[in-house]
Amino acid sequence: MPRYVIINADDFGLSCSINRGIMEAHRFGTVSSASLMVNTPGFQEAVSLAKSTPSLGVGLHFNLTYGTPATNPLLVPSLVGAGGSFHGNQAEWTCRDIARELYTQYGRMLKHGLRPTHVDSHQHIHLDNPVVYSLVKKLVQYEELPLRLPSNRPDPELPWVTDELFMYTYDSQIGVPHLLSLLCKIPEGITELLCHPGYVDDDVRRLSTMTTAREEELFVFIDPQVVVCIAELQAHGILQVIHYGQFQAIRSVLTRGR
């Protein structure tokens, strides 16, 4: 069976410096997909970049923990603190407010001319919170979109899920040798390789605890050894880099071939 990998950069739109790093990695032929935050400082720029770069698949990075909601804060009171920003306390969230914010964020992408290629979430809240998961699941089922799920948490009701999920960002062995090793170990089927490349600016320092690690990842993904390795694996038909917008067609072919 063929081997496919989606190299997905999270936090597209977090800041202009993150956008710059993701686009640089994409131009180098490594990052093929990105997950867009719609309520962060770099959103408008990210939309323009996405529209001018159709080779980059762009999904929704559902966010309930950073910044202010896409919805009027008065309409989602359980999600925000006194200042109108997300407080991140899941114990206070209500199903109604989560659903309202989810569909507002999804709708904001559509209103800006982008149909998400997939859905995932910031800080994996759809995996950690059962209510969030049930709401996101309903959305992707209705819209027929892929959803990020690890292989140890399969959902038979969701057909558009990768066979494997490699969370490169959370691996203690970040570096060129380790990434080269991972690329050579991509299994048959479709795998997502999750990463967080980007440059760091004041917005990133204000909004995220992940700072220098982003630049470290970026330098790995644009390293000549990595770029050449991916190009050679593709040239020899060993591995194909795709994005989530190509997922369903490839999955259908793979399913028919079984």
Regions found by a protein language model. Give the residues of each.
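Terminal accessory/targeting
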Residues: M1-I6, C16-G57, T65-H118, P130-R258
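Histidine-centered divalent metal-coordination motifs
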Residues: H61, H122-H124, H196
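DG-centered beta-turn motif at the end of beta-strands
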Residues: A9-F12
